[in-house]
Amino acid sequence: MIPKSHPRYESLVLRDKIVKAQKEGYLAESAMIAHGRGEAFDYLLGEKTTFPAKRAMYAAVATILLSENPVISVNGNTTALAIDEVIQFAKTVNAKIEINLFYRTDERVEKITELYKKHGYSQILGTKDDDIKYLKSIKNERASASKTGIYSADTVLVPLEDGDRAEILSKTGKKTITIDLNPLS
């Protein structure tokens, strides 16, 4: 039990969520490293949302609201850290949610699918039963895209992105919104 008085309480709660997700098998092994990297930048920024980041959030929401087919791309980290928030946001802005994993396995996809269903969201895309297409310019498992989701989306929100896929999505004419925890990228 983490005491709420701990100066890094919120950070430790998120860290526990990541560890739990790893144990449950829907988080890639390297996901803990990615989380730690993001956490380090958070410390450097003073654990505050910067003014430019707040402005970017407003612009991102406006872009999604003006889109005809917005999709939120989720992975294991996003699911572990913010599943309820992702679902609420998707419902609020009328966006679809699609599973898209760099280290894609049927087992991970099934576990993430079940988590979204348990949390009340049954229309999850990117499942093994979905009509999957492939984005030709991407040379890894993230090339998979639901025909009615990322493949045909006009706007894609990509939380926790390193940039390679976001760049390719943008080149295909999609508006691409990333939540990159690295302020230097």
Positions of the model-derived regions?
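Electropositive, gly/pro-rich neighborhoods at or near active sites that engage anionic ligands
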Residues: 1-96, 107
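Glycine-rich, acidic loop regions that bind phosphate or pyrophosphate groups
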Residues: 2-4, 157, 161-185
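Alpha-helix C-terminal capping/helix-to-coil transition sites in glycosyltransferase folds
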Residues: 66, 151-152
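Short, ordered loop/turn segments at secondary-structure junctions
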Residues: 75-77, 101-104, 181-182
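Long, charge-dense
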Residues: 88-142
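Hydrophobic/aromatic ligand-binding patch that stacks against planar heteroaromatic rings
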Residues: 89, 148-149, 167-169
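Active-site glycine-rich loop that binds ribose-phosphate moieties when present
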Residues: 132-151, 157-164
